Amino acid sequence: MRTPQGQQRLPSDWQGAFKLLLAYQRNQTPGKLETIPHGDTQVDIYDPLSEPRSTVIFVPGLAIRGREDPRIRRLGWALCATGLRVLIPDVPSIRALTISTRQPDEVATLLKSLAGDRTLVTTDDIVLMSVSFSSIFVLRAALDKALADRVNTLGLIGGYFDIEKVAD
């Protein structure tokens, strides 16, 4: 895309993606990180320096370090650097490396609880993201009427496709 002066300009979607990748690569930590209790779990909140454009709720995959995994923290900061408020909760059973048929409901209940708390989700729309094992649960929760109208974007990285096989 070219501007009237002949300079090349990236569409805003590409600018956002570029900014995210650059922030991730540089391991930038703009804004503020706070950990708060929420129900029976902990939630990391990454607040950008300016008014957030949207709120991301990111559910970690099956990993013992959960929200404290350095890769997850780095992604939280990178998303924050693009002007997003980021919430990263621990899902107790997933962090404990347990697999059960109760997890889809556990994740959905947690997401609805977070999204319904206006002190945590300060924007009208939300972005739901997840990686690996938790992605199928986040996808299922996004279809719930309590969340569907507010979900603007889904970002699922390396998720499983068969919830029945995952939960067996």
Model-identified regions with their sequence ranges:
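Alpha/beta-hydrolase-fold enzymes
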Residues: R140-D168
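Short beta-strand element of the alpha/beta-hydrolase
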Residues: R53-G61
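Glycine-rich nucleophile elbow surrounding the catalytic serine of serine-hydrolase chemistry
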Residues: S130-R140
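Short amphipathic alpha-helix adjacent to the substrate-entry channel of hydrolases
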Residues: P70-L87
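N-terminal cap/lid segment of alpha/beta-hydrolase-fold proteins
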Residues: T3-S54
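Alpha/beta-hydrolase fold nucleophile elbow
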Residues: T119-S132
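Alpha/beta-hydrolase active-site loop
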Residues: T98-L120
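Short beta-to-alpha linker loops that shape the active-site pocket of alpha/beta-hydrolase fold enzymes
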Residues: L62, R85, D90-I94, Y160
